[in-house]
Design a protein with these regions (language model features):
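Predominantly extracellular beta-rich ligand-binding scaffolds that present long acidic/polar faces
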Residues: 139
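C-terminal edge-of-domain segments
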Residues: 145-151
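Long beta-strand-rich cores associated with HINT superfamily self-processing modules
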Residues: 152-165
């Protein structure tokens, strides 16, 4: 999804890769899956089996903005979601000692990667990546969204914010109605300015 593209009705995923790390990862993944990979210079093509073509045919949304097919995040088993997450990080992410990041010009895909993290028991925050504001060769003029993957402090806490140590409950004067939301799986997930709360 990160580096690949496909045309409508095509049975081939096409890549243009230069980095040895990405090339090695693509080769290893195709070998593990038993999928055919061909190469011509920097151009690679993967023959996608018929049962996977619907999945890969849905990665380009409006205006060529990459997205995950909507049903993907709710139908894939956890091992497949883990593979998807690893693939996204290999394509457009970076793994650092302080945490993983994923960069994309697709705001929709950034939100979907954040949702993917939730399904994997992780958390993620989205921000506009300052490091790409002065860029010469990548992403064109689209804004870049950076998804910061959070692997620590995943235990839910009430009223947790910077400077809240020791203050978890208080009484607030209020006049007006209070509404309760109920959802089928008892998890309400809300995002405000790229920050998730559930």
């Amino acid at each position: 999804i990160g580096d690949g593209h496909t045309g409508p009705g095509s049975s081939r995923l096409r890549f243009r890769l230069r980095r040895e790390r990405k090339i090695n990862w693509l080769r290893a993944t195709c070998r593990d899956l038993g999928w055919r990979l061909t190469q011509s210079g920097e151009r690679f093509a993967v023959s996608v089996p018929a049962e996977w073509q619907e999945l890969f045919g849905g990665i380009d949304g409006r205006g060529g903005e990459k997205t995950l097919p909507k049903k993907l995040l709710v139908t894939l088993p956890r091992p497949a979601l883990e593979g998807l997450f690893d693939g996204l990080l290999e394509a457009d992410g970076c793994r650092m000692r302080t945490g993983d990041c994923y960069d994309t010009t697709s705001e929709v895909l950034a939100g979907q990667v954040q949702q993917l993290c939730l399904h994997l028991g992780l958390a993620a925050n989205i921000s506009q990546a300052d490091c790409y504001k002065e860029r010469d060769t990548s992403f064109g003029d689209k804004p870049v969204y950076r998804v910061h993957v959070v692997r620590r402090n995943l235990k839910p806490e009430v009223n947790k914010w910077s400077g809240s140590t020791g203050k978890t409950r208080w009484i607030e004067g209020w006049e007006g109605e209070v509404f309760c939301a109920e959802v089928p799986n008892n998890t309400l997930y809300v995002r405000r300015k790229g920050k998730p709360v559930w």
